Amino acid sequence: MLDTNMKTQLRAYLEKLTKPVELIATLDDSAKSAEIKELLAEIAELSDKVTFKEDNTLPVRKPSFLITNPGSQQGPRFAGSPLGHEFTSLVLALLWTGGHPSKEAQSLLEQIRDIDGDFEFETYYSLSCHNCPDVVQALNLMAVLNPRIKHTAIDGGTFQNEITERNVMGVPAVFVNGKEFGQGRMTLTEIVAKVDTGAEKRAAEALNKRDAYDVLIVGSGPAGAAAAVYSARKGIRTGLMGERFGGQVLDTVDIENYISVPKTEGQKLAGALKAHVSDYDVDVIDSQSASKLVPAATEGGLHQIETASGAVLKARSIIIATGAKWRNMNVPGEDQYRTKGVTYCPHCDGPLFKGKRVAVIGGGNSGVEAAIDLAGIVEHVTLLEFAPEMKADQVLQDKVRSLKNVDIILNAQTTEVKGDGSKVVGLEYRDRVSGDIHSVALAGIFVQIGLLPNTHWLEGALERNRMGEIIIDAKCETSVKGVFAAGDCTTVPYKQIIIATGEGAKASLSAFDYLIRTKIA
């Protein structure tokens, strides 16, 4: 199961264990059970602190295994294979169960230990999903820390019957005590806040006590991270606030055009950005979104950022780097069937539609790449492009046209998502040449029609263009003195990671120049 290199790395990690770990497998006669048994036996051979045993009498999913301590039943459970992107989740679960501390803030760990109530979480994942590990790891950690919290991470490919019964059409999909809890990427802080209902109020009260910053950066993607590093290096009081560190990068799989880094993955780059920021004196505020900008009443005064949690943060200068999100089709049925067949991540959710018919909306690079990827998994792909021709690179167009199970429809305006009340069953589109309406029967719709800037919260506060992008000049200055902007949320052309980081650095330098030239009001 594990090659020599993986065994060497895992053996080194297991040396960090400070207390014994027991792997308890519940298996059947399936090939997947044999695979898991082999994997667990290999892991146990790598450390004298790890033991493996079978107990096939337990009333749990088969195949599955519990990671616990001898004499205990507390800890995370994996149902199915924890390989692919989830192998890291397995390694971390072993470390945490074996006494190696988590790197999360101590205050957050104590909050988890103090959660009152019984919670049984179930998370469905796919081995190709790059968004799933964050959720699986967060809930695994909670199960290690609090005996009243249980978590089972379930491989959707192994338990396809449950995927069908529960209408899971997007991963990660989380259930708690048998009811839907959430879908898509969630941070540990976000999950804890949903479980601990008083957490948001306490967080807002704590934020309100923060002193004013010299520069407050709103958005923790590449632009925000670069701005934070450049600002902190100037020795000024720097705050960095965001919903999730890494931003849109977290939803990117392969990155091959970030100069000096020939190839990496979105999660790895986001982790590197976070590690770089942590090297400096930056007050990082996670899982917080801005709801309003209140510009300073006088030049040199304090600007205010109101958060969705009800807090108010103040700063002499602001850098807005809130990035962008996937653009919606804005047609009937899209909202109703979101995560029930309407999805935005082919890498995460593609395996859930194995052997089914799907559509991809959009003929740009993202859409054509999605169609190519999906063609190897699903029965058939229908690619719909609004314009008379696709806008993807020619090499991608040539590739997708060579695939026998992909149909391309141009001049197609999607008009409605069709469903049966619980899941997608098809879509309708209008031929923009003839005006005729056509129906396509399918199970999934992958929307790939570009990005929308995350600037809705700035309505009336500063100038934006008709696309919602913040209008900036060559120095990243906005229409409000002391407020700067950088990255995908601005009018800067070409939405690229490397451009966003450069713009973040530029915005930071401009903000510093503003601070040293402006008297404090």
UniProtKB/Swiss-Prot annotation:
Biological process GO annotation list?
cell redox homeostasis; response to reactive oxygen species
The cysteines covalently paired via disulfide bonds are: 345-348
Which positions in this protein are listed as binding FAD?
A: 214-229, 478-488
Q: How is the cofactor bound?
A: Binds 1 FAD per subunit.
List the GO molecular function terms. flavin adenine dinucleotide binding; NAD binding; NADH-dependent peroxiredoxin activity; thioredoxin-disulfide reductase (NADPH) activity
Keywords of the record, alphabetical order, are: Disulfide bond, FAD, Flavoprotein, NAD, NADP, Oxidoreductase, Redox-active center
Provide a GO CC annotation, any one: cytosol
- Binding of NAD(+): at which residues? 357-371
Enzyme nomenclature, EC number: 1.8.1.-
Q: Which cofactors does this gene product need?
A: FAD
The record's InterPro entries line, in alphabetical order, gives: AhpF_NTD_C, AhpF_NTD_N, Alkyl_hydroperoxide_Rdtase_suF, FAD/NAD-bd_sf, FAD/NAD-binding_dom, Ferredoxin-NADP_redctase_2, Pyr_nucl-diS_OxRdtase_2_AS, Thioredoxin-like_fold
Q: Where is the Glutaredoxin domain?
A: 109-208
Query: Tell me, how does this one assemble?
Result: Homodimer.
Query: Anything else of interest in the record?
Result: The active site is a redox-active disulfide bond.
* Record-stated family: Belongs to the class-II pyridine nucleotide-disulfide oxidoreductase family.
Q: What does this protein do?
A: Serves to protect the cell against DNA damage by alkyl hydroperoxides. It can use either NADH or NADPH as electron donor for direct reduction of redox dyes or of alkyl hydroperoxides when combined with the AhpC protein.
State the protein's name: Alkyl hydroperoxide reductase subunit F
Q: What species does this protein belong to?
A: Salmonella typhimurium (strain LT2 / SGSC1412 / ATCC 700720)
Encoding gene, per UniProt annotation: ahpF
